[in-house]
Amino acid sequence: MAQGPSCASELHYYRALDHANAGFATGTYHLKDDLHLATPPPHPSEAPVVNPNPLATVPTPPTSGVKLSLVSVGQRNKLPVFTSKEKVTAPPFADGNPALAAIPTKDGLKRRKPKNNIIKSSSSFVSRVITHEASSKRLNDRNPDGLFAFANINRAFQWLDLSSKNKEEPLAKILFTKAHMLTHDINELTKSSSHIDIAMGSSAGDIIWYEPISQKYARINKNGVVSNSPVTHIKWIPGSENMFMAAHANGQLVVYDKEKEDALFTPEISNHSAEAMKASSRLPLQVLKSVNSRNQKTNPVALWKLANQKISQFAFSPDQRHLAVVLEDGSLRVMDYLKEEVLDIFRSYYGGLICVCWSPDGKYIVTGGQDDLVTIWSFPERKIVARCQGHNSWVSTVAFDPWRCDERTYRFGSVGDDCRLLLWDFSVGMLHRPRAHQASARQRTSMIASNTQHFNRHRADSASNRMRSDSQRTADTYNDYDSAVRHPVEPRARTALLPPIMSKIVGDDPICWLGFQEDSIMTSSLEGHIRTWDRPREGINDSYNGNTSSPAISTSAAGSGSGIADSAMGSL
């Protein structure tokens, strides 16, 4: 395992919630692995860049660094009870549209696979596929509870076995011709020891449905026939075997079905008057094709336009009804995606928002952005809870640690272009607004609550309007749809500030992904470093069984937030 020369050898975090009787055990995270994936060179058909000029205006393919997806096909330890999905009561997406009802086939319950063999592919989109010579033996001999990792890095996509002694040797590696893979996701519902469904989005707008065990694939949105813009984020819709959602750089959210063919997309509002079209374009969500449409023979299943700027990321809520979307225009938009409507719009302090996630119980949304801040939003109260200051550059990923969350206290992490990994603990009781503004804050909260009740009634009325046929819609009808609550930016002086419990530089290049496992924390970077830190083990001191030379991140009690892990962070 290649270990980065300046990678943090230890991660120390400090308990910042002692005064609130919250927080979790302190300890040391020891660096277990530092796996380096090589960045593939440009395809030979591309003209080489002889003298790269940082001021050049020539467009280059967008990149996203290394993004990981982890999956275990065995009975690996499940998520904590706190993240249980037993409370999900929302109906499945597209439920009630007979045009999208599953059609029985002669295959019965057998999982369908893509039709094309990617190894033998003659497509100009795929350059080359390299498989491990002993991949079949490795798959048969491995522990089914071990982790597979799928990683995209520029025009390469790799399949790794993290439970193998030779984890640096991929089971398969796909090289695409010119397009860069920017995002991908695994369908947790359909995974098994013989089948894994992966959707990946490219800088060309094309989407690949890939099944790695059979090495079969299908190409969706070929040549941008539905949306000709790079795919910035992609996720399988919770509870669906076939449908996934893709965010495009042109501000569109598109729902695709892996089983459907593509067709040239024409907006289903094109037969409306110019006045109605103009009114529709001003909505926070312009429905260009509804999931309730009976025209469902081809992709897309649904297509929504949110803005004219890039959608950075989105996240599904644990209740499988709501969607949090962050955009380059600096907005956080919370949707009821089952009803196809925007409920609330929040704004960053300044600059675009880059990343978003939900707390395991669905009560909080956390965002990170170009203002170098991490922000906590309360979903039930529809307001900002705290701004988290600690990064020195753009925040690229935020994620909750489900093994360190309970009913009272939450832990999440963030990484960014400043090469830092930060950990944060918070509970509602520890967050206090400045006293001078508490009265006005209560007044604003009551106003928002009353407005929310008004808009909830308005949403019920506008929902009934959706029963009208498309030909009956007028400009006034579209204006009636705009029931989103637009929240003003809360001044920094009125917002609680939360310090991190740990801040550490963990590499030399920007960190672009963060993931939590029961026994470890993982990060990946722009230049291909995948690092794994073992969690502190209860009852074992910081000597880590006597091996004090092991690289690590360490945590120790430091009173009520007075000790911050990295003094170079500055005043919080």
Swiss-Prot record:
Residues 549-572 have a biased composition (Low complexity). WD repeats lie at residues 226-266, 306-347, 348-387, 390-434, 506-543. The keyword Transcription regulation applies. Disulfide bonds: none annotated. The keyword Repeat applies. Keywords: Repeat, Transcription, Transcription regulation, Ubl conjugation pathway, WD repeat. PANTHER family: AT02583P, WD REPEAT PROTEIN. This is Probable catabolite repression protein creC. It comes from Aspergillus oryzae (strain ATCC 42149 / RIB 40) (Yellow koji mold). The lineage of its organism: Eukaryota, Fungi, Dikarya, Ascomycota, Pezizomycotina.
